[in-house]
Amino acid sequence: DSGIEWIGQVPEHWEATKLKHVAAFSGGGTPSKENPDYWNGCIPWVSPKDMKHEVITDSIDHITTKGLENSATKLIDSGAVLLVARSGILRHTIPVGINNVPVSLNQDMKALSLDETRVRPRFILRWVQGLNRSLLGIWAKEGATVESLEHEYVANTRLPLPDLKEQDAILATLDLETARIDALISKSEQSITLLKERRAAFITAAVTGQIDLRGKQ
């Protein structure tokens, strides 16, 4: 047993640790909007609106080096796990991704820079995705006016952790299976789109006299 009620059974040889023991946490901030020298630079400034994909390659807004140096935000090296920490979207999901370029963050984001001698960033990505509903209940800040995650709850979450070799095997299996499922979803969506088009075309034909229904009366 993992000893963690909401996780349940895990292999006995997996290590039980806390997230804060394998990750360094960073927050973000917003450079002054009144200073144009801080904005429209080349440094991605990631906010919740950018968290629509697993891999974060860019952002809508960008800041300059001056903006970075004169605000609470900092440069996050590539390979960190990025979480939305404050947003209405936390009513139903925790958006999560990994940046493959250095980025800065706004104050509604958190970055987990991981000890890669112990854990793969993509393992944490999949862990958050797979346990999203449970983690939402555990991490939610009580009494907040806007949905947000409580840092202490996140940092102290217990994490069942296999060794790196097993993490790699798990990730490889997940990549294969999720790719297969995504392909099936895409095929199903294409079929649904085609059926909707046929339905609309049939209705159009029926109401414009293109279908002879006299023999069916």
Can you describe what each PLM-predicted range is?
Residues E15-H53, G67-S71:
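Low-complexity, Lys/Gly-biased intrinsically disordered segments
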Residues N99, T145-E150, D182, I192-T193:
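Short helix-capping and inter-helix turn/linker motifs at the boundaries of alpha-helical repeat units
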Residues V55-S59:
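Cytochrome P450 core scaffold surrounding the K-helix E-X-X-R motif
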Residues P102-K110, K141-D168:
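A short glycine-rich beta-alpha junction/loop motif
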Residues D1-G29, N156, P160, L164-D168, ...:
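Non-catalytic DNA-recognition/assembly elements of restriction-modification systems
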Residues I4, S32, E69-N70, G143, ...:
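Short, solvent-exposed loop/turn positions at domain surfaces
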Residues S47, T64-L131, E150:
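A short beta-sheet element
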Residues D1-E12, R180-Q217:
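Short amphipathic coiled-coil heptad-repeat segments
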